[in-house]
Amino acid sequence: MLAFVSGFLLDCLFGDPYWMPHPVRFMGNLISFLDKKLMGEKHKGEEKKADAPNGAGVKDDATIRSERRKGILLVICVLAATAIVSGIIFLGAYAIHPIAGFVVEAIMTYQILAARCLQKESTKVYTALKKNDLLGARYAVSMIVGRDTNVLDEAGVARAAVETVAESTSDGVIAPMLYTALGGPVLGMIYKAVNTMDSMVGYKSSRYLYFGRAAAKLDDVINWVPARISALLLIAGSAFLSV
């Protein structure tokens, strides 16, 4: 528990410096590698929504089943690699010395959480809006959302920021804290792996509609409880601040 609290305090103090290697980057590289190996190179039009013109078109049943199986294989490989690597690091550190284990556990917990990063990036949006700097606000919000922000007005920028903060409070703070508290940093890393897969392949596009289905569904399941806890906390916070 002390290592968990220490990791949380490290996140609050330092956030995620851009220069620091982060496990999510390695997870992302592995997912991209497996995506390419299982689905081949990306082609023009594959990122369009499946129901968009020139999108997925019609895929036969055999192709659908094949892509779903590949998606399940992706999930298994990424979760297995995450569990093995993080488990070796975690258990290996404690095998060397309890103090080494404590330090490694605190650092792993620190890297699992993203509270300070979320606060820092969302504050940039707020500051730009307070200065009536719409271009700056659009740029700042583009760093935390996955949509085109060039056409957003002030209300649109604010709405996008609030929506992202609400969602990221769940999958960047509450859910990682919950799973790390329940199963230590190894389970916390597994959660981050699922969340990263969903953010990379969990789209209803031509390429990922079936391939990314397993990752997207698993992400929905593991976020069901944390999302509701986050909603209650956000409602309570809004009432407390009279927002």
Description of each model-found segment:
Residues 1-189, 202-243:
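Hydrophobic alpha-helical transmembrane segments
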Residues 199:
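Glycine-rich phosphate/dinucleotide-binding loop and adjoining beta-alpha-beta core of small-molecule
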Residues 195:
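Substrate/ligand-engaging "lid" and interaction regions
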